[in-house]
Amino acid sequence: MYRALTRDIEVVVEPFYLEEQSDPEDDRYVWGYRIVISNNSGVAVRLVNRYWNITDQNGQVDEVTGPGVVGEQPRLSPGDTYEYSSGCPLDTPSGLMFGHYQMETDEGELFDVDIPAFSLDSPGLLRVLN
């Protein structure tokens, strides 16, 4: 698992390879990832936007931005946890992802919360990226 802490908001990522959706002979490699966001701060926040940097093993970068996550913009009161799962296809057997969530307090303050860098490694790889 990979962890990042920003302003007492913790983001934990657990990536996993989806063999049944992958087809290495067609250069299709698919990973899922589970994310848990815990608000350990003293203020409520809403996740309003996301930013991902996805880099394959050849250095090809794909940047993804958009509102919320999986169609939601969850509000986390102090002590709340939000969990979701998503996925990422690549054309190479390994890659790296990192990013941030833009959060907004009830008072309208916007700030970024780091998503830790995590590696996407196919089973059986001799060299891993992270």
Swiss-Prot record:
Residues 63-83 are annotated as: Disordered. InterPro entries: ApaG_domain (IPR007474), ApaG_sf (IPR036767), Uncharacterised_ApaG (IPR023065). One of its GO terms (biological process) is error-free translesion synthesis. Pfam families: DUF525. SUPFAM superfamilies: ApaG-like. Residues 3-127 form the ApaG domain. This is Protein ApaG. It comes from Rhizobium etli (strain ATCC 51251 / DSM 11541 / JCM 21823 / NBRC 15573 / CFN 42).
